[in-house]
Amino acid sequence: MLDWRLASAHFLLAMILMLWGSGKAFSVDLASEASEFGAESLQSPPTTREEKSATELAAKLLLLDDLVSLENDVFETKKKRSFSGFGSPLDRLSAGSVEHRGKQRRVVDHSKKRFGIPMDRIGRNRLSSSRG
């Protein structure tokens, strides 16, 4: 792994040296170019297009800030309510799944239900195999 890194580093250095020697490499002085660019930008006043884009950008940022503040107002944390009988407070989102007071429970008719016959009173041979 180290040999591969060393070989690739030598190859890159050789390519840079060849390009620099042939004059095809970038021979621009970056410090002088940066100072010229800085002086040029300070001398020329911003154009109307740049001013327009800056004001549009500021307006968009203010709009986004307003939207974020509205979103924070909407998504406030819910207050907790406590229910009698449970002893622990629940938030309002999970309260709907727990609360069953409003629902009426199904009434089961016990008159048709067959109760088992005691085995000590009747012999096993008298019981039918089917309940029909």
UniProtKB/Swiss-Prot annotation:
Residues 1-25 form the signal peptide. Highly expressed in skeletal muscle. Also expressed in leg tendons/ligaments and osteoblasts. In long bones and teeth, present in knee joint and periodontal ligaments (at protein level). GO terms for biological process: cell differentiation; cell surface receptor signaling pathway; endochondral bone growth; hormone-mediated signaling pathway; negative regulation of D-glucose import; negative regulation of dendrite extension; negative regulation of osteoblast differentiation; ossification. Transmembrane segments: none annotated. Keywords: Amidation, Cleavage on pair of basic residues, Developmental protein, Differentiation, Hormone, Osteogenesis, Secreted, Signal. InterPro entries: Osteocrin. The keyword Secreted applies. Induction: Is down-regulated by 1,25-dihydroxy vitamin D3. The keyword Mitochondrion does not apply. It is found in: Secreted. Its main location: secreted. The modification Arginine amide is found at residue 131. GO terms for molecular function: hormone activity; signaling receptor binding. One of its GO terms (cellular component) is extracellular space. It comes from the Eukaryota. Pfam families: Musclin. Belongs to the Osteocrin family. Hormone that acts as a ligand for natriuretic peptide receptor NPR3/NPR-C and promotes bone growth and physical endurance in muscle. Acts as a regulator of osteoblast differentiation and bone growth by binding to natriuretic peptide receptor NPR3/NPR-C, thereby preventing binding between NPR3/NPR-C and natriuretic peptides, leading to increase cGMP production. Required to enhance physical endurance: induced following physical exercise in muscle and promotes cGMP production, probably by interacting with NPR3/NPR-C. Interacts with NPR3. This is Osteocrin. It comes from Rattus norvegicus (Rat).
